[in-house]
Design a protein with these regions (language model features):
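Active-site-proximal cap/lid insertion segments
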Residues: 1-85, 89-136, 149-152, 156
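C-terminal cap/loop subdomain of S1 sulfatases and analogous C-terminal strand-loop tails that border
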Residues: 94-100, 140-143, 148-197
Length: 197
């Protein structure tokens, strides 16, 4: 895999804080997020290809380590004889930029690279091994799905959707929309407010 890259002009229609990441020493002193949130990701993202390749190698090393450790967890479930009755979900809270759009790490830049994250589910007897699913799912669905799998009534105040029918292949989708929250000053009149789909 090659490091991602920035394409000239791709930030032309984006909020100004996006383009500042292409500067060597951007000034974010006048930028504030609501609620006193930090400016995570608001810095220069200029890196040479050697640094990007080093970051990519480090990232792959971390992925390999996580793969090894998840394997140990699954082996332990097998050894204890509870693998067949245990729902395992492995995922993350966000993606990671490795040069895509000229960005590194993460931050308040909501491209698909940050939002479309992997998820692996193992639930023998219900979720077919090796099955793939491209349906939209949200992390808010996980607690509802876990309660449903355990046969525990879902409290009415929980807003997630049960994903078990989707994971088992009995449904094509559980939801047709999701929401990702960005703490920034945008209004309905903002030229930077975008809705895709």
């Amino acid at each position: 895999m090659e490091p991602g890259q920035y394409y000239e002009g791709e930030l032309d229609d984006m909020p100004p804080q996006y383009a500042k990441t292409r500067e060597a020493n951007p000034d974010y002193t006048n930028y504030r997020e609501e609620g006193g949130q930090g400016l995570h990701g608001f810095h220069s993202h200029l890196h040479d290809e050697v640094d990007l390749r080093r970051s990519l190698a480090c990232y792959y090393g971390m992925v390999s380590l996580i793969d090894q450790e998840v394997g140990r967890i699954l082996d332990t479930l097998d050894r204890l004889g509870i693998a067949e009755e245990t729902l395992v979900l492995f995922s993350t809270d966000h993606g990671h930029y490795l040069g895509q759009h000229g960005l590194i790490a993460k931050g308040a830049f909501h491209y698909e690279d940050l939002l479309r994250i992997p998820m692996v589910v193992r639930y023998p007897g219900l979720v077919p091994a090796g099955a793939r699913c491209d349906a939209l799912q949200c992390q808010v669905d996980w607690p509802v799905t876990f309660l449903s799998a355990a046969g525990i009534p879902v409290p009415g105040l929980m807003q997630g959707l049960n994903q078990l029918p989707l994971w088992s292949g009995d449904a094509d989708q559980a939801r047709n929309a999701g929401r990702r929250h960005l703490r920034a000053r945008l209004s309905a009149a903002s030229p930077y407010l975008r809705i895709k789909g």
